Design a protein with these regions (language model features):
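Short beta-strand->loop
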Residues: 105-115, 173-177, 195-196, 205-243
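Short secondary-structure boundary segments
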Residues: 89-90, 127, 200-202, 220-221, ...
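N-terminal signal peptide c-region/cleavage motif recognized by signal peptidases
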Residues: 14-16
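Hinge/capping helix and adjacent helix->loop/strand transition within the periplasmic-binding protein
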Residues: 77-83, 97-184, 233, 244-279
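Bacterial N-terminal signal peptides that target proteins for export
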Residues: 1-8
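N-terminal (or domain-start) structured segment
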Residues: 19-109, 147, 155, 171-200, ...
Length: 282
């Protein structure tokens, strides 16, 4: 019994010592989407704040493919020592159902590190679409089934699922155009190649405030301070579309708890800082 107790003490001490010296090299944050979208933007903003706290470079690597599965496969092959992380959102729960042979089980393979934000969704339309508000968009889709084009960053993404949910609620039909990442979608919304998009506020707020696109609804109970001129979905006649997306950091299963706690504390320090809050609100 004494020997067993001493073994537990040694294991705990080794983990604590590892956390005290962690990190010893560059920390890589994998995201499973192309540059330009919400995940990419948030990950890079947080990575910039983490580097001085952890006193090591924190880099973001875009590892795309199979709705994020390829990025998680890379994470699962990495050492569970905290130097490789993944930044994702609730769409990770869809991956095993889209790719059942991919060998990925979030409950089995991942260790949660820190939640970062719960973000509402925004419907925005191209300035060239002629659409002024949510009721007129819905009426247009019902009069012209399949004629409206909505873009998203790929199958299984939160944007894709949000658009499918919206169409189901309003009983209308539109073409859901799937891109490889959100960046190209935004470019096509601004140029008028497609009519609109539903995505997170972090992605669409800059387009609306700069008048490069027109936000017509936000999925919050009340209007948000950053876009006070944008009505809620409920104001537009669709109260059922009440949706917010969570984003967070994950590590490979088996990462020592003291290391996870060190990372969580550092991430919390970043997202609570005035500098980070100012960047996100812009």
């Amino acid at each position: 019994m004494t020997r067993l107790f001493l073994s537990f003490i040694l294991i705990f001490a080794a983990g604590f010592a590892g956390a005290q010296t962690f990190p010893t090299k560059t920390v890589t944050v994998i995201i499973g989407v192309a540059p330009g979208g919400t995940l990419d933007t948030l990950a890079r903003q947080i990575a910039a704040g983490l580097s001085p706290i952890l006193k090591q470079p924190v880099v973001v690597e875009n590892v795309t493919g199979a709705a994020g599965l390829v990025g998680f496969q890379r994470l699962m092959k990495s050492e569970p020592d905290g130097h490789t992380l993944n930044f994702s959102n609730m769409s990770l729960l869809i991956i095993p159902h889209m790719h059942p042979k991919g060998g990925f089980d979030p409950l089995r393979d991942l260790a949660p590190v820190a939640g970062v934000a719960t973000v509402p969704m925004v419907m925005a339309v191209s300035n060239k679409s002629g659409i002024k508000d949510l009721p007129s968009l819905i009426a247009h889709m019902r009069r012209n089934p399949g004629k409206v084009n909505l873009g998203n960053g790929g199958p299984g993404t939160t944007a894709h699922l949000s658009q499918a949910l919206f169409l189901n609620i309003v009983k209308a039909d539109a073409q859901l155009i799937q891109y490889r990442g959100t960046g190209p979608v935004l470019a096509d919304v601004m140029s008028g190649v497609i009519d609109g998009i539903i995505d997170q506020t972090v992605t669409l707020m800059p387009l609306h405030t700069s008048k490069r696109a027109h936000a017509i609804a936000v999925s919050t109970p009340r209007r948000i301070a950053q876009m006070p001129d944008v009505p809620t979905f409920a104001e537009g006649g669709v109260p059922e579309f009440d949706l917010r997306i969570w984003n967070g950091f994950l590590a490979p299963k088996g990462t020592p708890r003291p290391v996870l706690e060190r990372l969580a504390a550092a991430i919390s320090q970043v997202i609570d800082s005035p500098e980070y809050k100012e960047r996100v609100e812009k």
